[in-house]
Amino acid sequence: MRSGDLFQLYIKESHILRERVSSLVKAGWQIVNFISSNISDSASLEAEVIRATDCPWPLPDEDAWWTLDVVEEIDQWKDLSQGLFVYVSDFDGLIRSSPAEADTLYQHIARMQDRYRWERLRDGDEDLKFIYGFECSEKNLPLVREFFRGHVVVVDRFDPEHPELESAEALGPFAEEYPHLPG
């Protein structure tokens, strides 16, 4: 994990994630949802990356690391002009059942962030919006905080009229732990 990253967590019981996804879909965003219960090993992680990204390419006979290339190429078959929202359902379940695959899936999302946020900004394309988050149950919040070494914020609300906006005000009860965030 890169220092300075803050990972957005959505508490499963709050339904905020479902409402945000619905608002983003209405605004024309592309949604990639990795479903943790579909992942148990490298082969199932590969299949889940293909499923979640709607990748039109067939699965090659290689290990999971080739899918890092797939997540960088989504813009070849999806229209990302309005934005891209990536989230992992039941991430706490994946951490508990397969911590190595949870780490590998996180690396895929980090690669997507590099490609669709940082590279685009560096190249002067400030219009592409990229947001990602992880869903977990409230009871397993400590487990997920530990996985991300405490660098988390809980999304406790969003503006349905502007679901793409991220700010310190939109961050949950741990926001006071990150005073360096803009207000």
Predicted features along the sequence, with ranges:
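N-terminal intrinsically disordered, low-complexity segments enriched in P/E/S/T
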Residues: 1-59, 75-183
